[in-house]
Amino acid sequence: DGASIEIRSSDYYEHIITIAGNEGERFGDSLSTTSDGRQIIIGAPLAESNGISNVGKVYIYDRDVQRIQQTVTGNKTFTVEQTPQGRAEVYVNNVYQTNSTYYIGGTYTFTTKTATLATAPLLGDFVEIETNNVQLVDTIEMTNANQSAGFGSTVKICPTNCSVYAGAPTSNQEVPEGGSVTRAVNQSRLYGTITGTVATPTVTSGHKIRINNYVVEFTNTTLAQVVIDINNSNIPNVVASATADNKLTISLINVDAGEVANKLYVLPASSGATPLTDLGLDIFAVVQTITNPYPKDYTNFGHSISVSSDALTLVVGSPTGQSNLEVTLDAGKTTLDSDHTELRDISTQSGVVYTFDYLSSANDSILNPGKLVFGQQVVDTNVDKLSKFGNAVD
């Protein structure tokens, strides 16, 4: 008898969910994700903003993760509040677990909303379950919005997942189509604290938010009860309070104990972004608009963006910009007007790349953030006019 071998194969990628934008916005024209794939930044360069057409917007989405701490000795079952889309993924103390349905010797099974582990975690251990439910966290809009700016034509989140950069290459903020780049920071993640902008807010009883991926449910509508509900959730190193003018503050008890640029998450849960809006929690705050150090009409500064691996250097392409190089004579020995006059070699629309370096402030906070300052221009000395140097940077 001959043996038979059955081979099964499937696509590497499995469709889970579709994120749809508004018609006519060119939603999805640009896209970037955090290093763990849990947040998605999507540009929509033709979106209306503040009543002005075709300004552009940037949307931030989060892929739901729920963290549950082991509080009962021997417990093996952990239930999430949202039904997973596609396969749920399970981690114990940040260690990936394998599903017995798909892997021989797997470490858990999953039914509906409940993960059952083969081995019970120890007391104090935490279990994280990715449900693949994607929800809108925040919308970034352009400061000094102007028509046809193309804001969101290119987007990039830094490698430490705390800063979002959005290019507006056809912005008319300084000169016609001179372009700009906006930097917005996840303020709780970067600084370990966030304060709402709404005084004496009213929330909906039963609505939920996530703090460091722990789900917090509001049991009443008042700010005082929101503070109590958060503090009663016993989230490690997290405390909530009300300011003197009745705004919610969520912060780390010991900020220094938080991981750099990864200190505090404040995110939507099954209720969506509504409770965050009710509390005035603006997760991503715009802190700087960066423009061309050599502004010129139609240079499209911000057409391309890249961020260094340490998140301290921003690289911006201006593919229709003009090179602006100092000309030296006799290896710098000859000067003009006692070195008060410079000669410049300019090539029209040859393309330029600019670097910007991050300088932290003395007391870094959302009210006094560090800034990016111009570093240098990078050009190809052999480039010709209309070469579009800087059309892409990485």
What is the role of each PLM region?
Residues 1-65, 99, 123-124, 132-184, ...:
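Conserved beta-strand/short-helix segments
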Residues 64-102, 113, 120-133, 185-186, ...:
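Extended beta-strand solenoid/passenger and fiber regions
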Residues 91, 210-211:
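A general beta-strand register signal
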Residues 94, 222-236:
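Amphipathic, non-transmembrane alpha-helical segments in extracytoplasmic/periplasmic proteins
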Residues 183-197, 207-210, 241-284, 327:
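Acidic, small/polar residue-enriched beta-strand/turn segments
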Residues 213-222:
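Short, contiguous acidic and Ser/Thr-rich linear segments
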